[in-house]
């Protein structure tokens, strides 16, 4: 039974990996030919490389992990690994993509109807984010650690940030009448940047998002938005 559950989890992750390969821009960073490896053997090897990198990142700084390390952990010949990922950065970029999908899916389960005011919903989103990092510290490491691969120059990180902001914006507009002045999405992006900055500070000081900095991020985010949003937004009828 447990083996079947594990197979289902692997299939789910691999489906997400297939989505990456369909994305033409991201695929250029991951594989030379995005349609090349669809066989069961190819999927299994790609999955082993991803999980090998993830396991190594539990105990080692990401920047210290080499492609050779991942191949050894995964039991995949290095020559074969190049068919799936051109370098170690591509493996961690793929993991970051998978993490982002999972984070978005979890945050989408936070229902705005469960909270009387927008402050409660925002607090729940922030707390749920930290809960994800508590459950899997490798996710926080890949986002906030100083020793992560340099992904600057691609729009991937920005795209993920925008998707989170879009999610929060959609939930707010579904429930509340938002002010017609200013750009609320831009306000939420600034809010996200405030939260992200405080989380980064916490992680780089303590290698985790501490309760203190979780509270600081929540206070700062709500305080900023209170400059533009009333305490009680009118609800849509």
Language model regions located:
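Solvent-exposed, amphipathic alpha-helical segments
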Residues: 48, 52-59, 102-110, 194-205
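Alpha-helical DNA-contacting segments of helix-turn-helix folds
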Residues: 57, 91-102, 143, 160, ...
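Hydrophobic alpha-helical connector segments
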Residues: 94, 108-135, 191
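Helix-turn-helix
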Residues: 56-90, 94
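Amphipathic alpha-helical segments used for helix-helix packing
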Residues: 132-152, 169, 197-203, 207
């Amino acid at each position: 039974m447990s083996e079947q559950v594990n197979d289902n989890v692997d299939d789910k992750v691999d489906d997400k990996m297939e989505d990456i390969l369909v994305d033409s821009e991201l695929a250029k960073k991951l594989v030379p030919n995005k349609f090349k490896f669809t066989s069961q053997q190819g999927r299994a090897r790609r999955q082993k490389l991803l999980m090998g990198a993830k396991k190594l990142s539990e105990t080692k700084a990401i920047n210290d992990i080499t492609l050779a390390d991942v191949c050894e952990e995964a039991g995949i010949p290095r020559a074969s690994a190049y068919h799936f990922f051109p370098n170690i950065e591509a493996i961690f970029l793929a993991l970051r993509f998978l993490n982002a999908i999972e984070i978005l899916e979890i945050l989408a389960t936070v229902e705005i109807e469960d909270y009387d005011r927008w402050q409660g919903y925002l607090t729940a989103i922030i707390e749920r984010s930290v809960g994800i990092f508590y459950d899997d510290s490798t996710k926080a490491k890949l986002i906030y650690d100083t020793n992560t691969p340099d992904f600057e120059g691609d729009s991937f990180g920005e795209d993920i940030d925008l998707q989170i902001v879009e999610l929060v914006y959609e939930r707010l507009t579904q429930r509340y009448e938002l002010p017609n002045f200013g750009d609320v999405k831009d306000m939420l992006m600034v809010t996200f940047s405030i939260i992200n900055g405080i989380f980064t500070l916490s992680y780089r000081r303590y290698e985790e998002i501490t309760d203190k900095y979780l509270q600081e991020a929540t206070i700062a985010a709500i305080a900023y938005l209170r400059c533009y949003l009333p305490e009680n937004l009118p609800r849509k009828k």
